[in-house]
Amino acid sequence: MNSAALEGGFTAPPQQSAQAFRSVMQAMARPGRIYDIEGAVPPAPISIAAGTTLLTLADPTTGVHLTESFDKKEVRDWLTFHTGAPLVSATEAEFALGYWDELDTQAYQLGTAEYPDRSATLIVEMPELSQAGATLRGPGIETEAHLNLPEIALFKANRALFPLGLDFIFTSGARVAALPRSTQVS
């Protein structure tokens, strides 16, 4: 492991992890809203938002899958040192990190009827986040919200699987938004 892996974590772990957790949970509770998130300084190509999200949610009991662009020694070492999370295949992952075109959504766990919570959460690195584009409705949204999603049909199909399905966290720079499986997309 190189010394760069030791850097870039939370400098004030209790405060930063609590603030980051709140940002991620707010994003999940209010689909379509974009929140600022910071704390981590991960190696490229991980954004501040994705790195901070991983430091907040991943631990030694949660398998993380890295897509091709992120599956680099520096990233693996950094993630392992700061979270202890095992690096796993897509079929075993609780969390996955990647660009949209690299995430094979068919490969990840959708949960079961007995345990719908045993599904994967995909952390999708986006070029930008904006409250425009797809229309979102459902829990946590007063009337409707908007978010630039990479592909509307897939999110509609994912919603049809509810209570099974994938959850999505979108990151760009130091900003985060989310799309839980319960959200209707049009």
Predicted features, each with a name:
Residues T61-T62, K73-S186:
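Internal, well-folded beta-alpha domain core
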Residues M1-G63, T67-F70, F81, A174-R175, ...:
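N-terminal, charge-rich interaction modules
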